[in-house]
Amino acid sequence: TITCDVCKIYNEQGREAVVNLIKEDVINSVHHIESLTGCKFNDPENPQLVSVRSGAPVSMPGMMDTVLNLGINDEVAATLAKKSGNERFAWDSYRRFVQMYGDVVLGMKPQNKTDIDPFEEIIESVKAQKGVKFDTELDVEDLKLLVKLFKEAVKKSTGKDFPVNAWDQLWGAIYAVFDSWNNERAILYRQMNQIPESYGTAVNVQAMVYGNMGNSSATGVCFSRDAGTGENLFNGEYLINAQGEDVVAGVRTPQQIMTEGSRRWAKLQGISEEERKAKYPSLEETMPECAAQLVEIQARLEEHYRDMQDMEFTIQDGKLWLLQTRN
């Protein structure tokens, strides 16, 4: 974690001052991650990918930027495919990274609702040519094509080739998270919620876990209580074979974590119990052990923080990982 104090220095003195201050610590911390995982950052033979996410001292949901799968390039994608035995997962992770990095770090994200997202435009075009509706229906060759077209879009927009060195990617993402403290959405959110501008944001660099490795993997968000009423009712949503913001992006219909919530949702949607179980089963039904772990974890976290918790999680090959929690 790079602390909020560094963000203040970044805002006051700029990038060079921050690099001089924290470069050695960042390198040592990445080596610490490597010692825990047994993988190597910026090594195509045994690659360690990371996520870079913000950590504001006061919760600002959806306002700050995150980059996943950082450290990937053509060689790393080939290694991931070989090691995992899942070529589609490797290239899906790669196309997601180029899209996120282009949006967050290289400034290609649409600034308002009328702007066209160049990456989404490319995805929709490829899906239309293939005659499919969902991203999950694209095969390996389609995903390789997306990576190629995304990189061409980056070159056209920025005039530069997409960065392939993991350290260059990492520093770009660190700067972008600090910059996101002063993006229009974040400034407006702080004004509306009386959050001091001086707080700044931390940057969290985490080892990646993957919710997009297949049907035994998933990603989701959950709340220890009903966010609308405060009722003591654990609830949340998840998607099989997904990653990052897929759950809230509206591309696929997310499923409920608890069976009770799933039945309630189906009733509101006019979906029969038979169809619900076949098409939209709860996590409790598809991965009961992970659901039980989540129930236990949310209770422990709420007791510790003495407040309702908003959590993000990933399931990789049937193993649950909690990514973050906030009050």
Q: What does each model-found stretch correspond to?
A:
Residues 1-327:
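Nucleotide/phosphate-binding sheet-loop regions of phosphoryl- and nucleotidyl-transfer enzymes
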